[in-house]
């Protein structure tokens, strides 16, 4: 993947680079994500690009973001015919389908203000959108209060990676 050819712009999360959390998440994604997969809070599409390249069994990948400019950047970057794009706010609107796997680097800011409840709402949306036995792969800053939400909405979860800044988790519905 050539970063110089990707479309983004100031104001979109990690607009000019691949963020460290997403890079850590990608290093822990399996090759088989299932047939129906979603990228919740897709941003400019980095995680989706990696999933489509690394998991050939994906039949459909839904890219979902509440930020219109981010979704349009993802649309420009992710041209694979398996990708579909949805402009919606997962904190208040249901996902468009059910999934085998949801991958997420959830937002936790509104503007410049910290809003961990936003990330918690996205995790709850993932739980509602996953098929029984479906998997959530999640990266988040270590200090965010997401474990209680994972415990409340998933049958199990485990930490796949943990460094001084980020934690990658897999949760099973």
Describe each region flagged by the PLM.
Residues 19-104:
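Conserved SAM/SAH cofactor-binding pocket of Class I
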Residues 65-69, 118, 141-142:
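Short beta->alpha hinge that forms the Motif I/post-I loop of the SAM-binding pocket
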Residues 119-132:
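A short glycine-rich, Lys/Arg-flanked "PGG" loop and its adjoining helix->strand segment in the class I
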Residues 155, 162-173:
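Core SAM-dependent methyltransferase catalytic element
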Residues 57, 130-135:
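Short glycine-dipeptide loop
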Residues 101-113:
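A short SAM/SAH-binding and catalytic strip from SAM-dependent methyltransferases
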Residues 1-31:
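Class I SAM-dependent transferase core
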Residues 141-154:
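Conserved class I S-adenosyl-L-methionine
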């Amino acid at each position: 993947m050539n970063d110089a050819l990707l479309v983004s712009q100031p104001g979109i999360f990690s607009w000019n680079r691949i963020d460290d959390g997403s890079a850590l998440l990608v290093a822990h994604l399996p090759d088989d994500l299932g047939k129906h997969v979603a990228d919740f809070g897709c941003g400019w599409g980095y995680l989706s690009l990696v999933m489509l390249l690394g998991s050939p069994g994906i039949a459909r990948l839904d890219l979902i973001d509440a930020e219109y400019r981010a979704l349009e950047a993802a649309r420009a970057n992710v041209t694979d015919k398996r990708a579909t794009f949805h402009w919606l706010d997962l904190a208040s609107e249901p996902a468009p389908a059910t999934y085998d796997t949801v991958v997420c680097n959830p937002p936790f800011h509104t503007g410049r203000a910290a809003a961990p409840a936003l990330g918690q709402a996205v995790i709850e949306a993932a739980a509602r959108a996953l098929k029984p036995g479906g998997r959530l792969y999640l990266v988040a800053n270590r200090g965010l209060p997401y474990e209680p939400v994972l415990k409340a909405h998933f049958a199990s979860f485990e930490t796949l990676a943990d460094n001084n800044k980020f934690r990658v988790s897999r949760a099973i519905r």
